[in-house]
Amino acid sequence: MFSKFATRRKFLNCGKLSLLFLLNSCSNLPNKVKIALQNSFYPESFKDAIPKDWKQEKINFESLQLQKNRNAILNSEFTLINDGWISSIDFSEFEKINEYALFENLDKRSIDFLGSFDQNLSSKLFPIGVVPYTIIIKNNKELITSARTSWDFLLSEKLTGKIIFPQSPRIILSIAQKINSSNSLKKLKSQAMLFDDKNMLNWLINSDAIVAIVPYSLCSKYLKIDPRLSLVFPSQGVPLMWHFLLSRSNLNNVILIKWIKSLENKSIVDKLVSHGWYLPFNSDYLQSKYKTEMLPISGPSKKCWENSWSFPVLTLSLIHI
């Protein structure tokens, strides 16, 4: 009788010890790596390429003053941002990304672009993607032919009140500077139907608009559902939108390097490019994606890339380093 109780007591004690060991093991597991990003900025193929065991924290750069957005950034190891929102970020909250293994991956275009920033700022920015703007034309073969060489076609009388522009003065100004006409900015603005960054393609499909100028990465699903739409990348070049990664701690460099290396997988590269997202790295396979001479639907030509342009930060004085 006594031996039965002793055996049962041993069994219960072993069970307690196993439970304590399990709880202790769970408590020692590392927390999930968090990466903050604005969901609407990124194609699904890019979000799918983020490690599955990372937690994607959704933020909105238009509402950075809201505490929930600030908390999401402060509680995340990494943050993704594009060049249009750099001046809204307090860079003192981020660390320098000083890992040579990361920066040796970058191509000449991204290195040159980083060189346009203040050194204290550029040391905290890691280029993770470059997206060319594209012209989408609805049902007009004549305009498509004209658009393939330059931006001058935007001043056509047929397009008065028929163009949807980005809600970005610097993009509109940069395009106006490419147009061979006096008072090109004033004339260009008079062609506008509206200025919009969120629903431009819906407007194009469901209105009398004929042309929209949008980031390539936002186009793919619309091209599949509406055969009236055609993509054009003028050989004169297009504006480029850059995306960067910011880090809150250098303790995660090993994790970060592993992810960056994984993006160079050929199948991932192909998916990203098909959705308008180009990795600014120096591998031969990646660089071949910048040299296409195929139809415009496959992306900018080599000549278009060579003539394309990037934007420096508009207000460095507003950035806290």
Regions found by a protein language model. Give the residues of each.
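N-terminal secretory signal peptides and thylakoid transit peptides that target proteins
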Residues: M1-L20
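Early extracytoplasmic/lumenal segment of secretory-pathway proteins
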Residues: S27-S92
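A structural signal for short loop-to-beta-strand junctions that line the ligand-binding cleft
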Residues: F78-T79, I97-I135
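Ligand-binding pocket segment of bilobal, Venus flytrap-like solute-binding proteins
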Residues: D83-I89, I164-Q236
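Short beta-strand->loop
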Residues: I97-L106, L125, K224-P239, R248-S249
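A bilobed periplasmic-binding-protein/Venus flytrap-type ligand-binding module shared by bacterial periplasmic
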Residues: T134-E142, L240-L256, K271-V273, F281
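Periplasmic-binding protein-like
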Residues: L159-S168, S262-Q287
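Conserved small/polar residues in nucleotide/adenosyl-binding loops
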Residues: I319-I321
